[in-house]
C-alpha cells in the first residue's frame, strides 16, 4: 500500500511538472507569435521582387551613296534609333573627312527632298538597313550671317546717299537746293527699320543653327542692297519733290509707320518666347499688350505690321521705287503668311478657323 501511494504521488508530481512545462511553452509561443505579428505589420505589405529589365537598343546600318554617281561611299554601323540626321552627318564626316556636315545634304532617294537635321533615324527606317544619298551642297553660310548681311547693307547704303557724296550727285546742285524735312524724316525711319532688324536678329529671333548655300546670301543681298540704292537715290536727290498733300500726309504716314514698327517688334518678341504654359507648340494668343491684339484677326500679324510699315513709308515719301519694293514685299510676305497659315490650320484648327492669314477679312 505504501508503495502504491508513493507511485501515485510521483505520477501526480510528473503530471504537474508536465502541465507547467506545457504552459511555459505556450506562453513562449504566444510571445513569439505576438512579436512576429508586430514585425510583419511594421514591415508593411509584401512587395514582389522587381524583375530586372534588360533594355534592348536597336541599331541600324546606314549605307550612304553618292547621289550623282550612285556609288557607295561608306557604311555606318551601330547607329542607334534615337540618332538624328545631324548625328549621321557627324559620323559620316568622321568616316569620310572630305564630306563636311554643313555641306552635306542627305536624301532617301535621288531627287527627293533633303532630310532635316532634327529627323530621327527611327522615323525614316523601314528595316535595319537604311539607304541614304549624299549631295555636296557647295559653300555654305550660317543663317545669322545671311540676315546680318541683308540688313547691314541697306542701313549703310542709305546713309551714303543721305550724305550726298559728290560721286553720286552734282555737288553744285546739292549745295544750291535745301532738303525738305521729309528727307530727314525718311532717313530716320529707314534707319530705325533696319536697326530694329539687326537688334532682333542678334537678341530676339531664335535663328536656326543650320546653313544655306552661298548663292542664297548673294541673291538676298543683291535684292535688298539694289532696291535700297534705288530708293535712297530718289529720296535724297536734290531734285526730289515732296508729297502732294504736304505735312498732313507726311505726319499721318510717319505716325502710322512708327506704330507698325512697334507692333512688329512686340509680335516678334512674343513669337520668340513660349507662352505662359511653357509650350512652344501652342498657337500664340494675345496678351495685355494692345499690339498683340492683331492675333484676334490674323494668324501672322508680324507680316501685317511689316507691310503696314512699307505702305506708310511709300505714302510718306511718295516715290515710285518705294512703291515697287512695297508691292514685291507684299507678294512675298503673303506667300509666307499663307504657308504658315496652312500649318496653323492643321495643328490648331479650333483656334484660327475664322482668322485670315495676313490681311484681316481679306487674305
From Swiss-Prot:
PTM annotation (Phosphoserine): residues: 37
InterPro entries named in the record: 3-oxo-5_a-steroid_4-DH_C, SRD5A/TECR, TECR-like_N, TECRL_Ubl
Keyword Zinc-finger among UniProt keywords: no
Pfam families the UniProt entry points to: Steroid_dh, TECR_N
EC number per UniProt: 1.3.1.-
Keyword line: Disease variant, Endoplasmic reticulum, Membrane, Oxidoreductase, Phosphoprotein, Transmembrane, Transmembrane helix
Cellular compartments annotated: Membrane; Endoplasmic reticulum
An individual GO BP term: very long-chain fatty acid biosynthetic process
UniProt key word Aminoacyl-tRNA synthetase: no
Membrane topology: Multi-pass membrane protein
Disease entry from the Swiss-Prot or TrEMBL record: Ventricular tachycardia, catecholaminergic polymorphic, 3: An arrhythmogenic disorder characterized by stress-induced, bidirectional ventricular tachycardia that may degenerate into cardiac arrest and cause sudden death. Patients present with recurrent syncope, or sudden death after physical activity or emotional stress. CPVT3 is an autosomal recessive disorder with onset at early age and associated with sudden death in childhood. Patients manifest QT prolongation on adrenergic stimulation.
TM regions (residue ranges): 143-163, 217-237, 311-331
Tissue and organ expression note: Predominantly expressed in the heart and skeletal muscle.
CDD domains given in the database record: Ubl_TECRL
Protein name per Swiss-Prot or TrEMBL: Trans-2,3-enoyl-CoA reductase-like
GO cellular component: endoplasmic reticulum; membrane
Family designation: Belongs to the steroid 5-alpha reductase family.
GO molecular function: oxidoreductase activity; oxidoreductase activity, acting on the CH-CH group of donors
Amino acid at each position: 500500500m505504501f508503495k502504491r501511494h508513493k507511485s501515485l504521488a510521483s505520477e501526480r508530481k510528473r503530471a504537474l511538472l508536465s502541465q507547467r512545462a506545457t504552459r511555459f511553452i505556450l506562453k513562449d509561443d504566444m510571445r513569439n507569435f505576438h512579436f512576429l505579428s508586430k514585425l510583419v505589420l511594421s514591415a508593411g505589405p509584401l512587395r514582389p521582387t522587381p524583375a530586372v529589365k534588360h533594355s534592348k537598343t536597336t541599331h541600324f546600318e546606314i549605307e550612304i551613296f553618292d547621289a550623282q554617281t550612285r556609288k557607295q561611299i561608306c557604311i555606318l554601323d551601330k547607329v542607334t534609333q534615337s540618332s538624328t540626321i545631324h548625328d549621321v552627318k557627324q559620323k559620316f564626316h568622321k568616316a569620310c573627312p572630305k564630306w563636311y556636315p554643313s555641306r552635306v545634304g542627305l536624301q532617301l532617294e535621288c531627287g527627293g527632298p533633303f532630310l532635316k537635321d532634327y529627323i530621327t533615324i527611327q522615323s525614316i527606317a523601314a528595316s535595319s538597313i537604311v539607304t541614304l544619298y549624299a549631295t555636296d551642297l557647295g559653300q555654305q553660310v550660317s543663317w545669322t550671317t545671311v540676315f546680318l548681311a541683308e540688313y547691314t547693307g541697306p542701313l549703310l547704303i542709305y546713309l551714303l546717299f543721305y550724305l550726298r557724296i559728290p560721286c553720286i550727285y552734282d555737288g553744285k546742285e546739292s549745295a544750291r537746293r535745301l532738303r525738305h524735312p521729309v528727307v530727314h524724316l525718311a532717313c530716320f525711319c529707314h534707319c530705325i527699320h533696319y536697326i530694329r532688324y539687326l537688334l532682333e536678329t542678334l537678341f530676339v529671333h531664335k535663328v536656326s543653327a543650320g546653313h544655306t548655300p552661298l548663292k542664297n546670301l548673294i541673291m538676298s543681298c543683291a535684292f535688298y542692297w539694289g532696291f535700297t540704292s534705288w530708293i535712297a537715290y530718289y529720296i535724297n536727290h536734290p531734285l526730289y519733290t515732296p508729297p502732294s498733300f504736304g505735312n498732313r500726309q507726311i505726319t499721318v504716314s510717319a505716325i502710322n509707320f512708327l506704330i507698325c514698327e512697334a507692333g512688329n517688334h512686340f509680335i516678334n518678341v512674343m513669337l520668340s518666347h513660349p507662352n505662359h504654359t511653357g509650350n512652344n507648340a501652342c498657337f500664340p494668343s494675345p496678351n495685355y499688350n494692345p499690339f498683340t491684339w492683331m492675333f484676334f484677326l490674323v494668324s501672322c500679324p508680324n507680316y501685317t505690321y511689316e507691310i503696314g510699315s512699307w505702305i506708310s513709308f511709300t505714302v510718306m515719301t511718295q516715290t515710285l521705287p518705294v512703291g515697287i519694293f512695297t508691292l514685291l514685299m507684299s507678294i512675298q510676305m503673303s506667300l509666307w503668311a499663307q504657308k504658315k497659315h496652312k500649318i496653323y490650320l492643321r495643328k490648331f484648327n479650333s483656334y484660327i478657323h475664322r482668322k485670315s492669314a495676313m490681311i484681316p477679312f481679306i487674305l
